Structures are given as structure tokens and as C-alpha cells.
Amino acid sequence: MIDQFSIRNLGRNKLVSWENLSSMNLLIGTNGTGKTSVLKMLYAVLKSLETYKQGREPRAFNDILALKLYWTFQVERLGELVTKGEKSSLAVNLILDQKKCEFEFGEGTQTKIVKYASDFTSSWDNSCIFIPAKEVLTLSKIILTTRDQENLFGFDDTYLDLVRALEIPSKKGKNFQAFAEGRTRLSELLHGVVDFDEKTGQ
């Protein structure tokens, strides 16, 4: 569970600080105030911790994070994420399951995050997903082609990770409780079910 999360100098957000979060939290604000950027930053950090030392993953955490930020925000250099005109760095501090993870970088940063510290010695034992505003089921093949084969900007990592997660067939005995409950609640709320035809992509 996220115990604490703060960001300094991310785009329009000079300071965002959350403490004492519950299992479900709501972020409300008018359009154009940087809500999505904050959530994408949180997602990129959590997904990087999830990937770090997972299986035979050889890369250092800061390398995984830098690449995740690049493909999530789709910027030519990481320094573009820093609030324009600010002399101080973009800084992120996260306390997750009582373990700390923090990093920072300035406007001149290209692709490498040098200043970072983490209490995580193994991968974060959870899965996170970001559900973007656009519908992805019918675009899944285009998203995979654009990113996996052509390595082009257009669909950021939030889309790609969601499509990959949806592609994984459910394994016998691996019907996670949270997902099962979520599907049941959605079915009750919508009075129906989602049926996806892999052959037609609809």
C-alpha cells in the first residue's frame, strides 16, 4: 500500500504531496491541471518497482525507471518533464509498504537518472495497471504494432501495458480475488458482460 507520495516540479505541478492514503483514493480537479501527469508518474514508478529484479531482469532500478518514464511520457529527454523555468530538480518520493524510493533529475537530464535511492532489494510483489481515457480493446493490434514492432511514439506505456495485461490468458487457479470481484461488480453495474473476439479484434 502507498503510505506517502510526493512530487516536486513535474510540469504544471510545483508540489503534490499525499499522506495517509486509503485503499481507494480519488483525484479531482479541472482539466489541464496536471492530474494525468501525476498519475502517470506514480504509475511509472510503481511499474518500475514491479519490473525491478523480476525473474531474470538484469537492469538497475534507475535504468528501468528512466526507460519507463521515456515511454510513458514520450519525451525526447527526461528533462522536458521538469517544470519550465524552475531552478530546482523534479523530485519524487514514495513510501510503499514501508519502503522508501526516491529520485530526482534536472532540466538538463537526457536519458539517465543518477540521483536515486531505494529500499527495494527485490521486485514489488504486486501488479499495477493504468486505465487510459481511450478505449483500447479495438486498438490493441495497432498499439502492439506501433510499439513492439515499430518503436514509435503515439501510444504510451499505459496503453501498451494494458494491452499486454489483457492478452495474458487467465491460468487455471490464477483467478485473482480482486479481479474476480471487480468483474462481478462491473457485470452487476452494467447489467452485462464484456465479450472480446480475438479473431475480429472487437
What are these regions (language model features)?
Residues 1-47:
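Pre-Walker A-like glycine/lysine-rich segment at the N-terminus of P-loop NTPase domains
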Residues 6, 48-202:
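Phosphate-coordinating catalytic segments in nucleotide- and nucleic-acid-processing enzymes
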